[in-house]
């Protein structure tokens, strides 16, 4: 299972500190999902070797309109393992779920964002994961927490009905906000998610990383078609 983190300068903790806490929390890896204007400077391989967790380079595209978002996605797709689109705007939500090159639509219900069955079906058709962001449930209180729970339940129902793919995250911006998978699963169960759904959502980040690394390596010509090494042919 993986967690997707915001590291310094987009958060308060370095990538290395996030990785250490993730390892202690029994994650297999982290995705560094900083926004494009606040990217982190880090050596993923060195950190991975030091702490025994995978460190995947991601990006969270944040834009005011779909045309700019499209340009950013195109710019980052070839060199980032995970491409996330910062949701919460109705136009951006729609753009993201209609783009097969987008891996994840993040927090689509945030701010004045909305998500409906049409967008859920588009996400299913294009293989775009919808994020269940548990961060507000873990960190908000009072009316804000109640609203966050209500929005997550609505989002879960839409995603389930459409059969759309999804990820789960606590969206930590500091290592102190990282919660162990068992804790996130427990929180999910208290707000109406079953344990298997939360576990699947945490695992899906790693599936994205594995699939995209394979594609970037050139081993995949098109979905379902792989290049085999000469060594394999010789066996």
From Swiss-Prot:
Enzyme Commission designation: 3.1.26.5
Q: Which GO terms describe its cellular component?
A: cytoplasm; ribonuclease P complex
Signal sequence bounds: none
- Give the main localization category: cytoplasm
**BP terms from Gene Ontology:** tRNA 5'-leader removal
The Swiss-Prot or TrEMBL record annotates one GO molecular function as:
ribonuclease P activity
The listed locations are: Cytoplasm
What is its EC class? hydrolase
* One Pfam family recorded for the sequence: RNase_P_p30
Q: Keywords of this protein's UniProt record, alphabetized?
A: Cytoplasm, Endonuclease, Hydrolase, Nuclease, tRNA processing
Q: Which InterPro entries match?
A: Pol/histidinol_Pase-like, RNase_P_comp-3_arc, RNase_P_p30
Which proteins does it associate with, and in what oligomeric form? Answer: Consists of a catalytic RNA component and at least 4-5 protein subunits.
Function recorded in the entry: Part of ribonuclease P, a protein complex that generates mature tRNA molecules by cleaving their 5'-ends.
Question: What family name appears in the similarity comment?
Answer: Belongs to the eukaryotic/archaeal RNase P protein component 3 family.
The molecule here is called: Ribonuclease P protein component 3
Q: Which organism is it from?
A: Haloarcula marismortui (strain ATCC 43049 / DSM 3752 / JCM 8966 / VKM B-1809) (Halobacterium marismortui)
The organism's taxonomy opens as:
Archaea, Methanobacteriati, Methanobacteriota, Stenosarchaea group, Halobacteria
């Amino acid at each position: 299972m993986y967690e997707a983190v915001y590291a310094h300068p987009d958060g308060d903790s370095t990538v290395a500190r996030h990785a250490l806490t993730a390892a202690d929390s029994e994650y297999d890896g982290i995705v560094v999902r900083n926004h494009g204007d606040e990217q982190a400077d880090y050596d993923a391989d060195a950190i991975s070797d030091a702490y025994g967790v995978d460190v995947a380079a991601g990006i969270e595209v944040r834009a005011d309109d779909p045309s700019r978002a499209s340009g950013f996605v195109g710019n980052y797709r070839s060199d980032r393992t995970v491409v996330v689109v910062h949701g919460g705007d109705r136009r951006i939500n729609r753009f993201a779920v209609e783009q097969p090159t987008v891996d994840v639509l993040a927090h689509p219900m945030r701010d004045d964002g909305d998500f409906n069955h049409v967008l859920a079906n588009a996400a299913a058709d294009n293989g775009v994961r919808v994020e269940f962001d548990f961060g507000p449930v873990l960190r908000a209180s009072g009316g804000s927490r109640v609203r966050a729970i209500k929005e997550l339940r609505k989002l879960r129902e839409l995603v389930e009905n459409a059969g759309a793919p999804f990820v789960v995250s606590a969206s930590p911006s500091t290592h102190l906000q990282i919660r162990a998978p068992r804790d996130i699963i427990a929180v999910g169960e208290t707000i109406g998610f079953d344990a298997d759904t939360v576990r699947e959502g945490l695992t899906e980040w790693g599936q994205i990383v594995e699939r995209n690394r394979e594609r970037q390596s050139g081993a995949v010509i098109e979905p379902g078609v792989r290049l085999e090494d000469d060594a394999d042919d010789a066996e």
